[in-house]
């Protein structure tokens, strides 16, 4: 089993992969930055119907389930009153926050006064449920605040992280900061309990780390970035505990060695993805080469030994995660939808750190074949697990008792525009081929990007770039790793270009040029060894 190999190897890791805080340069990396989806309007034969269903079906389903079919909103109402029972699972608060994040993203591209009113009503309930010291978690408020912060597996920081993501999103969408202020009070409460010279804490389900980076970027408060870094550094030192409620499994919780010494993936798949996202975010802002080296090793292990052809990860139902390398059964595959979304999130971050298109290749695979499999074309039925083989008894469901995947999709789909374009000091990057119009500003230059394509059904892409003044940036078009031959032209004239890390690099272009990329979409087989 993989975990036993990890245990046996841990002594050697101290010598073979030794890195320390000295690897931190304390200067942000010169990295690629995504073009936010708020600047991108999608008009695409493949994606537009799905985004329309998100508005008309997915969000209404989530709202109905949260308000009427389950007790999720009622938990906040009861917590505000300080009476009543807690309904559902101890981490159900997170589904409400994720759905609210999805509502915020929807409001950016589809303003809706009624939806905004609904979101404001929810936020009022969150604020009312917050304790005087800033703590907010309906499970412990209703079952006993004396037990809070005693079991690292009870998802307190996980729920807080999703609240922070929702608070940041809603503030960016509407300018309203009521929820953001709730998040700040909760974070300050956590920092009063944990940190250097205080109590140790290893979040049983990662999420808070990447959320704290978003809070830092929104508030520019360095302490939140430092807290994210401290939480990452807590792992692998024997601090994990479930109190008197069970035995802590360091492999399952990614707590077997310090994160800098990680060499291969183990444990719960979604937790791994969120951990790696947090590491990537902190690495970028602190220029931590130790974190980057660890993620290089982990990515190689995930993609070459533990990933399905669909881009799905996590084969085991027992731990919702990983067992041995190459243990990838079809019929019994787990491949949780949330894990595929996590692959998208992590691989985008790796691309931003490196400028290598191999990460977008994996992102695209996980997006189209893993994450999207989790939702019906009607937008109202969902898969939690995504096996590659079925005997006809595996069907999408309206909802789940553990509803992390439906609520995950409610926030992921409307933000799909985040993954199309990126920018760096010297280039504009085109990562995904989706019909859209992008309006962005770089420095003093306004840029209009228009992309026309029938991708993924066809490999032809037409990109028109108009600028308010000359822009001295390269255009970098990703050439997918499945594409063996392609033609590239500007204004109908074929051009030859160099390739760097999987991107066709166009250096000579001017405003209103029409760049055409024609990729051969050929069928090919991908063989797996039987031994």
Language model: regions and residue ranges:
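Positively charged n-region of N-terminal signal peptides that target proteins for export
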Residues: 1-4
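Solvent-exposed beta-strand/loop surfaces of large extracellular or lumenal domains
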Residues: 483-507, 523
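C-terminal beta-strand-rich structural cap/linker in extracellular carbohydrate-active enzymes
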Residues: 475-476, 507-520
């Amino acid at each position: 089993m993989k975990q036993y190999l990890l245990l046996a190897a841990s002594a050697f890791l101290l010598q073979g992969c030794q890195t320390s805080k000295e690897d931190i340069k304390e200067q942000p990396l010169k990295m690629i930055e995504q073009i936010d989806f708020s600047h991108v309007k999608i008009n695409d034969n493949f994606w537009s119907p799905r985004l329309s269903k998100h508005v008309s079906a997915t969000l209404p389903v989530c709202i109905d389930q949260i308000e009427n079919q389950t007790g999720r909103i009622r938990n906040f109402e009861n917590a505000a009153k300080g009476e009543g029972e807690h309904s559902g699972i101890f981490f159900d608060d997170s589904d409400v926050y994720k759905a609210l994040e999805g509502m915020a993203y929807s409001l950016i591209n589809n303003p809706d006064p009624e939806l905004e009113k609904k979101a404001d009503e929810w936020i009022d309930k969150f604020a009312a449920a917050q304790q005087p010291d800033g703590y907010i978690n309906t499970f412990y408020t209703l079952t006993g605040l004396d037990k809070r912060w005693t079991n690292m597996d009870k998802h307190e920081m996980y729920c807080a992280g999703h609240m922070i993501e929702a608070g940041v999103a809603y503030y960016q969408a509407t300018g309203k900061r009521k929820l953001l202020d709730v998040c700040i009070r909760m974070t300050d409460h956590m920092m009063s309990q944990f940190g250097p010279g205080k109590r140790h804490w290893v979040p049983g389900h990662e999420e808070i780390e990447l959320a704290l980076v978003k809070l830092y970027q929104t508030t520019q408060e360095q302490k939140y970035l430092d807290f994210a870094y401290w939480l990452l550094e807590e792992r692998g030192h024997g601090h994990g505990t479930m109190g008197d409620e069970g035995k802590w499994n360091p492999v399952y919780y990614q707590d077997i060695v310090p994160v800098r010494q990680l060499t291969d993936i183990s444990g719960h798949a979604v937790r791994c993805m969120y951990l790696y996202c947090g590491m990537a975010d902190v690495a970028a802002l602190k220029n931590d080469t130790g974190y980057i080296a660890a993620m290089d090793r982990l990515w190689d292990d995930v993609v070459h030994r533990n990933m399905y052809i669909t881009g799905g990860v996590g084969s085991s139902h027992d731990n919702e995660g990983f067992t041995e390398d190459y243990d990838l059964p079809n019929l019994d595959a787990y491949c949780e939808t949330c894990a595929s979304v996590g692959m998208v999130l992590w691989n985008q971050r790796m691309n931003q750190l490196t400028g290598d298109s191999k990460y977008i290749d994996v992102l695209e695979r996980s997006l189209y074949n893993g994450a999207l499999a989790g939702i019906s074309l009607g937008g109202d039925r969902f898969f939690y697990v995504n096996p590659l083989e079925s005997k006809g008894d595996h069907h999408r469901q309206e909802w789940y008792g553990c509803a992390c995947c439906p609520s995950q999709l409610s926030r992921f789909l409307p933000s799909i525009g985040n993954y199309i374009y990126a920018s760096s000091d010297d280039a504009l990057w085109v990562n995904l081929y989706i019909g859209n119009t992008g309006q962005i500003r770089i420095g003093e230059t306004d840029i209009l990007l228009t992309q026309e394509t029938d991708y993924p059904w066809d490999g032809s892409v037409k990109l028109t770039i108009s600028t308010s003044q000359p822009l001295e940036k390269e255009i970098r078009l990703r050439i997918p790793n499945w594409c063996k031959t392609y033609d590239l032209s500007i204004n109908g004239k074929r051009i030859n270009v160099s390739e760097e890390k999987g991107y066709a690099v166009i250096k000579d272009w001017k405003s209103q040029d029409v760049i055409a990329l024609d990729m051969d979409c050929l069928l090919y087989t991908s063989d797996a060894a039987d031994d």
